[in-house]
Amino acid sequence: MAKAKFERIKPHVNVGTIGHVDHGKTTLTAAISAVLSKTYGGEVKNFAQIDNAPEERERGITINTSHIEYDTPIRHYAHVDCPGHADYVKNMITGAAQMDGAILVVAATDGPMPQTREHILLSRQVGVPFIIVFMNKCDMVDDEELLELVEMEVRELLSEYDFPGDDLPVIQGSALKALEGQPEWEAKILELAEALDTYIPEPARDIDKPFLLPIEDVFSISGRGTVVTGRVERGIVRVSDEVEIVGVRPTTKTTCTGVEMFRKLLDEGRAGENCGVLLRGTKRDDVERGQVLAKPGSINPHTTFESEVYVLSKEEGGRHTPFFKGYRPQFFFRTTDVTGTIELPEGVEMVMPGDNIKMVVTLIYPIAMDDGLRFAIREGGRTVGAGVVAKIIA
């Protein structure tokens, strides 16, 4: 009898390169692809293929991003690389490419530069949890002390933004020399891959997180009660589970008495599935679109938060003119628009289309949120910006 083919599904981790322009992010991406495919198998992407990043649209925002994949013995990685600084800003704020960890590329010949700092700050704001440093172009620096100095500088900069600068891995290498096949530098790429494997923990799968379903629609079924529908964002809901209805109004508790999908009754609804959840003793008017159904105690409603925002340029269909403090647009969270006011950082009078900016937002009513929640800014149904909740205030 033929044996069934054994396929081990490796854990999947999302990473990306960040850092200052011309410090070697794309060359490093190509070097990782080349060295790992040579060592562990897989498809090679060369520099030109990665550099020619296709245009993508995420929430109406044009972003150029290159996606490559590679394997280590224990994991499968999806890696994003962006050609331009603006692409990084947009990518990180919209969450188009969410990263479980980032590889910060710093040229040893230059040390940290303005965009190095900006990418670290962005990583902190949008919740990139882990950073590994690759000091590039080390073949061009003969002085050991200089390399040590640059490493110290990078570690201090990371600590300044609350990353564990003293403890995180720093690998000194040369992406170009590794790409040219020089064994001593190829070894540095393998060292980087090992750091990815050991330093970035395996991310929790959506299905293992606490249950959350953004409510899209509410129906009442005579004799059975109220059904809310939507796509389960994370976790699992089972019949007879206690759930909370969070956001917009005071939080209430109820019980799931049924789950249905495509008119069939199920025992549970899981992350990624569109389903209807029947709620015990809940009236049709007690629930509305914009609220979420969640595991009790797992998420709270908030109105005020600090955010990192990218304002669409005129070419992207955004505003043609700047906006000022006191601007009152709609903030679109998950399934609904909420009006809010903004507070700009000290010394900032106006925000131009194409800018990215830190702002404090106060909504007119509370929405269920955690740090890292993405939102769109809209005016009359047109998207004019994208943002992420960096820190909840109230």
From Swiss-Prot:
Locations listed in the record: Cytoplasm
Region of interest: G3: 81-84
Domain of life: Bacteria
SUPFAM superfamilies: EF-Tu/eEF-1alpha/eIF2-gamma C-terminal domain, P-loop containing nucleoside triphosphate hydrolases, Translation proteins
Domain called tr-type G: residue spans: 10-204
PANTHER family: ELONGATION FACTOR TU, MITOCHONDRIAL (PTHR43721:SF22), ELONGATION FACTOR TU-RELATED (PTHR43721)
Descriptive protein name: Elongation factor Tu 2
Organism: Shewanella frigidimarina (strain NCIMB 400)
Lineage start: Bacteria, Pseudomonadati, Pseudomonadota, Gammaproteobacteria, Alteromonadales
